[in-house]
Amino acid sequence: MGQKTNPIGNRLGIIRGWDSNWYGGNDYGDKLAEDHKIRKYIHARLSKASVSKVIIERTLKLVTVTITTARPGIIIGKGGQEVDKLKEELKKVTDKEVQINIFEIKRPELDAYLVATSIARQIESRISYRRAIKMAIAASMRMNAEGIKVLISGRLNGAEMARSEGFKEGRIPLSTFRADIDYALAEAHTTYGRMGIKVWIMKGEVYGKRDLSPLAGMDKKQSGTGGGKGGDAPRGKSNFNKGGKPDARKRK
């Protein structure tokens, strides 16, 4: 019944790790609500920075927030000014010392959340949903994805009755636990109402032991409780242009 479950939750502890790492104790509910508040704030504050995951780790007096993004330069800012501002803002949310780490996503076309949000933003810009989805699928397959599936639901083309339409290329073996499948859901807010976009991306199969850290294989751009002052950080290269649309040019 792999089709009925969230592919990420279904693989936790097997080939996927957790995005929140801490011991809750009696304050579990408060910390969980605070994690949700931090993630919601970061995604709203950095909406133009192509943020995917926000990983939160806690000790007694320190909250470590790790942000994975396709455009780290926007978050860091000139001389680390922007990341310092973000750190101070998160301090007010948590009432604790905050450390921010930034990791670059090298291939955003293989990140389900970035693909889903890119499709949603294009639909909001009145681009045909079929065109947006087919461009996203082509971009992912060019980056050597083994398969991708997109399901869109809502009042498509302004139809009177809501319906769903699916697009698929390659293979998505949802019942195979060793299959490395990324999944995400995004919403497009249009004049006809909300549309839901679900994306599954098959990256390959995992054999043997695997590092369950969500950051395995990523490049760290900046870290530290102060966010760092070590000059301008390079802006991450992405196959998504400024409007959030996949760039049709093939990466060399």
UniProtKB/Swiss-Prot annotation:
Residues 214-252 are annotated as: Disordered. GO terms for biological process: translation. PROSITE patterns: KH_TYPE_2, RIBOSOMAL_S3. Binds the lower part of the 30S subunit head. Binds mRNA in the 70S ribosome, positioning it for translation. Part of the 30S ribosomal subunit. Forms a tight complex with proteins S10 and S14. Belongs to the universal ribosomal protein uS3 family. This is Small ribosomal subunit protein uS3. The gene is rpsC.
